[in-house]
């Protein structure tokens, strides 16, 4: 067997799967090394994909030719579009998935990807020569050689699990940790740290009193994660909600002395936006209840996931506390919740391509960069895989801007600001979120993927056809005139003001009460135009309506983004000796030396860099 590859990806989680698929589909001879081929794409925590901002990332991965969206659609057991009551910039798709099917769907994708080989083993050491990674050695003693390596090891690097005072080595429940790999990297000047995450108890559905819970149903309209998924009705299994109470909190408080988070056993930092139940009761002592979500793990299992009850308290405390909730009075569990500590690497030592600034041709993606979440990992993975291929075969680095994708925001935040806690994406982190909607990820990114070779001709033509149809609908509304006497009765029925004189159709659709769907039956010529749409009709109509209703906001945000682009075009890397620029503040000098930003715009986003510091650099550049 030949153990020489263009690209090797270490770890087959969500980052690793996307990285390996991207590199291989672009033509690189690729090897994906995993400790367990039966855990490829494992959902280590909740059996769900998407959510606020995360759903947008999955759509972006799909638009770039990745697979997370397709795998999710094929294994979904409930779909919802979150934040529908808000504007479309906030709409976020989310799906419950069948955990077991998700793994096997990912495995089928990867096993059928040309240029990709899967190897089951544990990597112990990277081979680094003259500041460049050239290969690796596994625990079986196999030496691999590679032009580029992508590290996507998740929580497995020196992983340590906690339940009460009990500590157990492992990267996930009943799975061994990976040792020595961190040390083989840090000895070359890369900085590592420790972070913590956790997962909740898993429950036997047969022990739950569902009649004491509220149901949470799915939705069955046209929305999906993938732009190329086959249109089909997704299965819609129920989820349920319930609440903790003061009795639950009392039991939890009684166990705090045995909590590894509060007795000093765990020193590392956990995710702020996914706190454990014990953190909730400590930080919000006056809150009488906390909402919990009970989610199915799959179609053919009794196992349920209790979202909102992450805990590393002793098992007996977890069970006793839950039994104080009426619906869980006869509770039976499959396994308790636990916390896990793991190694991560300082992401400010990375380029925007996710290649290390310290070790050439070594890329990092996923939780090893200090992020949390399947979606954040997948987004980093596809970018790392693309750039690893480019490093092997030549080409311009692939970098996504903050106005192009949530993935661009994510990576820029990591490499520019760094992390002091597990990083989770939110819509509030994106300054151009009206430009980064879930409905238009394909129109933002698929052409770039096509030029790379990651998206094929037929998909690109499908995009062009969609864009043409949207343009046709919008242009019709701009030119078609409406007479007041012909439409006023309909407007009154729809709860909006009557016209005093004629107007263009686009002006009517701009009203809050009017949609394309409810106005079209009253405008036969418009209905005729809509009926000409042959494929993806609902998707095209929604996109056209968003463009019409939010044109002013979209144009304004685009103008602001274009102004910032001027700073993005001013390259400063290698132009200054920051240590000797006394006109900069001490903090600015320290931060600029550490981050070594590529552009003036990136410098302006570094915490501690003031507008006056940017003005100093502009003056020195002669601008």
Residue positions per predicted region:
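Conserved N-terminal/central alpha/beta ligand/cofactor-binding core
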Residues: 4, 21-125, 140, 152-172, ...
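Short hydrophobic core segments
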Residues: 10, 143-154
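A glycine-rich dinucleotide-binding beta-alpha-beta segment and adjacent secondary-structure elements
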Residues: 305-371, 399-412, 537-591, 596
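Internal hydrophobic alpha-helix adjacent to the cofactor/substrate pocket in enzyme cavities
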Residues: 377-398
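Extended, charge-enriched "interface" segments that sit outside catalytic cores
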Residues: 429, 446-615, 619-622
